[in-house]
């Protein structure tokens, strides 16, 4: 049975979107803790021999445990596609970006800036809250007409410590007609 991963996209006006600025998502907690197996699988796939990913004793002394590669930050929060406790298919929660009411049916990521404040190590259980930071007035680009939407994701580990912040800017637009 295939799971429907489609989301309902919110439509509205720029003024509707401005009223959402400052809104935050419900906290979303990873299904599993950061694990050595996933750290090392990722490092193996990208051929990264950083000792902090492979040498448990070295990593424990330097970071408090095997260090999670920075590129895995958002990956820890991706839910498994199926769990034995599920009854039928469960629709994943749509991200805050999809719920911002704006015109436009197409997205492109314009910028992403991640700040790591504390090491993320094996055993950490991450929770993220997303906040709508800003929506630009309408912009005309070669891609089409739309709005830049900026969000801030704040990642915390199980003790409440903020470990990372991810500022993302996305351009939501209506594609320009082909020449």
Model-predicted segments: where are they?
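HotDog/MaoC-like acyl-thioester-processing domains
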Residues: 1-27, 109-179
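Hot-dog-fold acyl-thioester-processing enzymes
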Residues: 2-111, 177-179
């Amino acid at each position: 049975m295939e799971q429907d991963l489609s989301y309902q996209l919110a439509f509205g006006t720029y003024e509707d979107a401005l009223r959402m600025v400052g809104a935050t998502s419900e906290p979303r907690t990873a299904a599993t803790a950061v694990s050595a197996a996933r750290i090392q699988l990722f490092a193996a796939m990208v051929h990264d021999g950083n000792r902090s990913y492979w040498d448990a004793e070295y990593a424990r002394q330097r970071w408090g445990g095997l260090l999670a590669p920075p590129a895995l930050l958002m990956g820890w929060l991706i839910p498994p596609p199926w769990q034995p406790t599920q009854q039928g298919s469960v629709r994943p929660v749509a991200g805050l970006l999809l719920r911002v009411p704006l015109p436009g049916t197409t997205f492109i990521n314009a910028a992403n800036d991640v700040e790591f404040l504390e090491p993320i190590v094996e055993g950490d259980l991450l929770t993220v809250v997303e906040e709508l930071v800003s929506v630009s007035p309408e912009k005309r680009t070669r891609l089409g007409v739309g709005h830049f939407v900026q969000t801030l994701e704040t990642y915390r580990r199980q003790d409440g410590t903020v470990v990372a912040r991810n500022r993302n800017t996305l351009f939501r637009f209506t594609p320009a007609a082909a020449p």
